[in-house]
């Protein structure tokens, strides 16, 4: 919230505990005139992205999801980990352990060097959002 405030963005929070809460939470956000919605990676939200999109699309509010799957089922865009690359990177670490080159306890924590931009172009077009050419080169 503090970082968003430095960028002139006011964060409005909504909490859901189960799929049945999605419609009410989304409607409340729409009624507060939010300009966009961000959804973190969450199984409840992931299973209800189509429901969320139905409400937000009608209000022309874009949803930015935390992962590719959620983006393709109701979001507009995301910068997220590439799960294939993450698995590959984990496999390399496991290979070191299996080959006796390292002990699990001694392996450093690794993060992905590159993240993946995924855009749901159909939804962006539906909402009247133009994807800048500068971003198109990074799209997957």
Label every PLM stretch briefly.
Residues 1-140:
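Short hydrophobic alpha-helices and adjacent helix-cap/hinge residues
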């Amino acid at each position: 919230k503090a970082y968003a405030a430095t960028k002139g963005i006011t964060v409005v929070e909504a909490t859901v505990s189960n799929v049945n809460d999605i419609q009410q939470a989304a409607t409340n956000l729409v009624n507060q005139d939010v300009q966009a919605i961000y959804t973190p990676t969450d199984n409840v939200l992931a299973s209800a992205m189509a429901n969320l999109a139905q409400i937000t699309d009608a209000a022309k509010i874009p949803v930015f999801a935390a992962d590719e799957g959620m983006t393709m089922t109701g979001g507009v865009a995301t910068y997220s980990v590439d799960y294939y690359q993450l698995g590959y990177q984990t496999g390399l670490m496991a290979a070191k352990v299996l080959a006796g080159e390292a002990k699990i306890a001694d392996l450093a924590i690794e993060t992905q060097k590159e993240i993946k931009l995924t855009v749901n172009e159909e939804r962006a077009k539906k909402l009247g959002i133009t994807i800048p050419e500068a971003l198109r080169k990074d799209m997957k």
